Structure formats: C-alpha cells, structure tokens
Amino acid sequence: MSGKGAPELSVRNVGDLRVAVIASQWHDKVMDGLVDGALRALHELGIDEPTLLRVPGSFELPVVAKVLAGRGYDAIVALGVVIRGGTPHFDYVCQGVTQGLVQVSVETGVPVGFGVLTCDTEEQALDRAGIEGSSEDKGHEAVTAAVATAATLRSVSEPWR
C-alpha cells in the first residue's frame, strides 16, 4: 500500500482560505472519485465555496494553476490521472505535469496539492480514487496537504507577538 506512513495532519481555522481545485477529464470514474474526495475534504475543513475548474487532461493543469496562483488563491489542488501505455508519452506527461506544478508552487508561494495519479494500470488508479472499495483517497489527501501548507505559510507571515 503506497499510503503507508502518511502523516495525520491537523488543520484548523482555515475556513476563510480561497481554494481552487483543477481537475482533468480523462478517466472519468477515477476523476469523479478524486473530485468528490477533494470537495468532501474542503467541506470538512469549513471551506464551503471552493472554485472547481475542469481541464482536458493532466498536461493542462500547470498553466491553469499558474493563472489561479496570480489571482489571490491561498491554495490550489491539481487532480488528474495518467495511466501508462505502450509509448514514452506517459513519462513525458508525468514529468511535465509534476515539474510544472512544483514550479508554480515555488515561483508563486502558493501551495499546490498534488493529486495527480501516475499509475501503471487503471486498477491502481481506482484503488487510489476514493471510491467505494478504494484503499486510498488521494483527492482528499491533496486538499489536506495544500490547505495545511497554506495554513503554515499564513502562520509564518503573521507578525510574531
């Protein structure tokens, strides 16, 4: 199980954060689970009006994240799924998406929750999608990570008393 050793994050007083979720459209059953998990996590954190945007595929996530980071969002969550095929396309997409999202976060100071599944099989993706029978909920985890990081950034930018 890849989730072994995951931290238990405690996130409080974040209901005022502006959070955007960007989700790709490939592999709709997996994506529906990821989006549902992300929205559920936001609701549990008291963030009831997130922005939800859809993009064609995972490769489009970084450019939309970059624009949103410049529009006052406190955290962004990128959701997608890339499943290995018989060509190097998988490697190029995974590397481009990962590098692009990290670059957005580092350059803008806005945390980007990484909820992009990079799997060898559809079964692996379904097992991480947060749907019935899944062992993990990566949409929920990506939100928690992004919001927890935004809360940390907010705490270090506030004046010390």
From Swiss-Prot:
PANTHER family: 6,7-DIMETHYL-8-RIBITYLLUMAZINE SYNTHASE, 6,7-DIMETHYL-8-RIBITYLLUMAZINE SYNTHASE DMRL SYNTHASE LUMAZINE SYNTHASE. One of its GO terms (molecular function) is 6,7-dimethyl-8-ribityllumazine synthase activity. GO terms for biological process: riboflavin biosynthetic process. It catalyses: (2S)-2-hydroxy-3-oxobutyl phosphate + 5-amino-6-(D-ribitylamino)uracil = 6,7-dimethyl-8-(1-D-ribityl)lumazine + phosphate + 2 H2O + H(+). The gene is ribH. Pathway: Cofactor biosynthesis; riboflavin biosynthesis; riboflavin from 2-hydroxy-3-oxobutyl phosphate and 5-amino-6-(D-ribitylamino)uracil: step 1/2. The keyword NADP does not apply. It comes from Streptomyces coelicolor (strain ATCC BAA-471 / A3(2) / M145). HAMAP family: Lumazine_synth. The keyword Transferase applies. SUPFAM superfamilies: Lumazine synthase. (2S)-2-hydroxy-3-oxobutyl phosphate binds at residues 86-87, 128. Its EC number is 2.5.1.78. This is 6,7-dimethyl-8-ribityllumazine synthase.
